[in-house]
């Protein structure tokens, strides 16, 4: 009986005791916010000092009691802001609520703007992406491995706060914006690092879901306090924060528009004139580019935000997430990186989505990863390491899978040359030979670019070879789908082969340039000229600048490899029309050019579906396949909620539709492409604006799209 009573008492204590784990956010040189969650008692006390045995200052804070549909526990959210601290100083602290106290932890305030943290002039950051999954120990394993790696790199007796200033999480900190997920997915899975390193967050699409949605995000984080040069975004969706000589710009890919872009321009104007800022890093949840689930990116980030950021010579890179893998690429003409740090969320491997190999992506690896960014403040250098713990199919022990860098004030590579001698006309195939890569600072070759044109000024490119020394894309062999293949293994990228019959006969010009692994381009080589003869079959191309146009907006068609007849022409017709039987909507002759553009300045006045064709010698022989496009208003689709019960009714509102014959709305699973995958649900649209309801969807992630018949 005594044993039974003892066991029962012990179980009750375990059930009702409160283990306290602090969560740090919003670091500055003079302050730190400390948060934690309990299930009872509104006492909020932090006790801190300059040594673990001398905690002699007490700070009290506030407690908010949150409630949420379906959350049956108490949720006391404690917040204490410690102020009047010294810059770049290590403090020891513990937190207290009632009779419960945490262990003693430590944090470090940020250095003054422009200054390093360490004695050897460094400041470092951790970057991590999506966690989301509650039921599996994925993200907690990732943070534990990051904790271990910091110990391994900087010494077993060191604390994370000694060598890293903060962690940036790039969105989808939760799967849905509920109290349950903030408690058990975000806070609980971060306890390896959150007592030592402040965590700054970016809004992801999953923060907008669930019973509380963004209100839960706003309640847990204090982004409205963050300013740069006294500039606030005026909301908690996006912000700029300086740490040392780095300015982080956390964008919201979920709240795009002119207001955010205007704010971004204000931030850049200040940063460009701020001598304490040497580097700018931007972040958004939806990425700049992606080679899986192609198109699932932020077009606003790609087309608006990043082009604006690249106008600053302080801009280093853009970091995205959303895709649950690691990817790294470079902007084609500018010395800027773009990353996906996709954490450990729902499985994403080769063969489960639409995939495409893009020039501006050097590697896509389906690993669960984190990155350590090391900034050498004194010498103007940034080095980034990416560590992997593997994934579902293969585990890895903090394996280093990528490194890259950017160093200021370094020389560009030596100017290359085309070493071929063209003393007579040539027949294809032709291998263009570039000179050996050379750099005065021992940088290695990363990228080469060969351009071939029939125009001496390269105004129209007939053929381009743009290659990195490595190109990790697609499944490798017949093994597990996490294995990625290096498509450029064994390829000498200083050589480029023009295949037989791939370009037409005629005179061509060629030039090349080389890029090193510091993202510096060489000067272009001297141009060489050659003549192709005996090419029987050309490889003409024909593209439009867009697939959707508003009424009366310009339409540009670009063609290469044409026959070169004086009256070759580009024409536009309505969908379903035969060119020989009707008058075109408009046409333009090529005037004997084999390559060029046809600009329809005033576009088309009437909404509808059309196609453009490339025709030979004033007749109706089509040189290339037709290009279909749409003219009309931009349709707006809006779901009434972000989440729905399984089998329930999904309501889609639409407006500004063209209301053509048999327009329809389809429901597809994320990653599926209309026309190549079976849709889940669909229905016709009969008005320009209205509502459609879809019922019976199984569990999963979906999107709605407006399609034309």
What are these regions (language model features)?
Residues 23-31, 331-412:
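Binuclear metal-dependent phosphoesterase catalytic core
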């Amino acid at each position: 009986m005594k044993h039974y009573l003892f066991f029962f008492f012990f179980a009750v204590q375990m059930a009702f005791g409160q283990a306290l784990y602090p969560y740090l956010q919003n670091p500055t040189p003079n302050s730190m916010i400390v948060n934690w969650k309990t299930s009872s008692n509104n006492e909020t006390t932090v006790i801190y000092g300059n040594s673990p045995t001398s905690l002699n200052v007490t700070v009290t804070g506030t407690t908010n009691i949150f409630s949420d549909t379906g959350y049956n526990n108490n949720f006391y959210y404690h917040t204490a802001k410690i102020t009047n601290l010294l810059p770049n100083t290590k403090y020891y602290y513990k937190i207290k609520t009632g009779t419960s106290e945490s262990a003693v932890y430590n944090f470090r305030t940020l250095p003054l703007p422009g200054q390093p943290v360490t004695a050897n002039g460094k400041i470092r950051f951790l970057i991590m992406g999506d966690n989301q999954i509650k039921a599996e120990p994925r993200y907690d394993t990732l943070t534990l491995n990051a904790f271990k790696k910091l110990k391994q790199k900087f010494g077993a007796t060191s604390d994370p706060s000694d060598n890293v200033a903060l962690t940036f999480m790039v969105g989808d900190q939760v799967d849905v914006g509920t109290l349950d997920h903030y408690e058990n997915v975000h806070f609980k899975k971060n306890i390896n690092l959150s007592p030592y390193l402040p965590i700054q967050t970016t809004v992801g699409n999953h923060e907008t879901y669930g019973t509380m949605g963004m209100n839960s995000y706003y309640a847990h984080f204090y982004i409205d306090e963050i300013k740069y040069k006294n500039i606030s975004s005026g909301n908690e969706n996006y912000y700029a924060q300086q740490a040392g000589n780095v300015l982080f710009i956390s964008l919201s890919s979920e709240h795009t528009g002119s207001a955010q872009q205007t704010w971004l321009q204000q931030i850049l104007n200040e940063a460009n004139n701020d001598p304490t800022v040497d580097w700018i890093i931007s972040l958004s949840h939806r990425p700049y580019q992606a080679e899986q689930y192609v198109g699932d990116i932020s077009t606003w980030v790609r087309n608006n935000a990043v082009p604006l950021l690249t106008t600053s010579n302080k801009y280093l890179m853009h970091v995205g997430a959303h895709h649950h893998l690691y990817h790294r690429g470079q902007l084609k003409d500018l010395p800027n990186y773009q990353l996906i740090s996709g954490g450990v969320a729902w499985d994403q491997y080769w063969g489960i989505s639409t995939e495409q190999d893009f020039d501006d992506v050097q590697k896509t690896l389906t690993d669960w990863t984190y990155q350590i960014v090391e900034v050498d403040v004194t010498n103007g250098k940034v080095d980034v390491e990416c560590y992997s713990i593997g994934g579902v199919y293969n585990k890895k022990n903090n394996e280093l899978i990528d490194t890259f860098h950017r160093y200021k004030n370094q020389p560009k590579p030596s100017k290359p040359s085309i070493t071929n001698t063209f003393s007579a006309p040539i027949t294809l195939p032709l291998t263009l030979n570039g000179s050996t890569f050379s750099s005065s600072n021992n940088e290695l070759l990363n990228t080469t670019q060969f351009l071939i044109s029939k125009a001496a000024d390269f105004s129209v490119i007939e053929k381009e070879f743009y290659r990195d020394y490595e190109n990790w894309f697609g499944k490798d062999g017949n093994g597990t789908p996490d294995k990625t293949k290096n498509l450029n293994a064994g390829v000498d990228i200083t050589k480029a082969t023009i295949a037989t019959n791939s370009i037409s006969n005629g005179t061509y010009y060629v030039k090349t340039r080389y890029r090193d692994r510091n993202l510096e381009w060489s000067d272009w080589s001297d141009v060489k000229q050659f003549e192709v003869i005996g090419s029987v079959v050309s490889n003409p191309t024909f593209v439009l600048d867009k697939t959707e146009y508003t009424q009366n907006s310009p339409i540009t068609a670009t063609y290469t490899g044409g026959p070169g007849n004086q009256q070759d022409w580009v024409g536009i017709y309505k969908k379903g029309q035969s060119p020989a039987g009707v008058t075109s909507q408009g046409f333009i002759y090529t005037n004997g050019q084999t390559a060029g553009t046809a600009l329809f300045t005033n576009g088309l006045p009437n909404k509808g579906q059309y196609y453009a064709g490339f025709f030979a010698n004033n007749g109706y022989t089509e040189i290339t396949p037709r290009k279909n496009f749409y003219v009309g208003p931009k349709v707006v689709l809006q779901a009434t909620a972000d989440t729905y019960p399984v089998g329930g009714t999904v309501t889609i509102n639409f407006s500004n539709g063209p209301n053509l014959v048999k327009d329809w709305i389809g429901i597809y699973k994320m990653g599926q492409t209309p026309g190549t995958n079976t849709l889940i649900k669909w229905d016709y649209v009969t008005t320009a604006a209205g509502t459609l309801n879809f019922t019976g969807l199984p569990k999963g992630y979906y999107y709605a799209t407006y399609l034309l018949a």
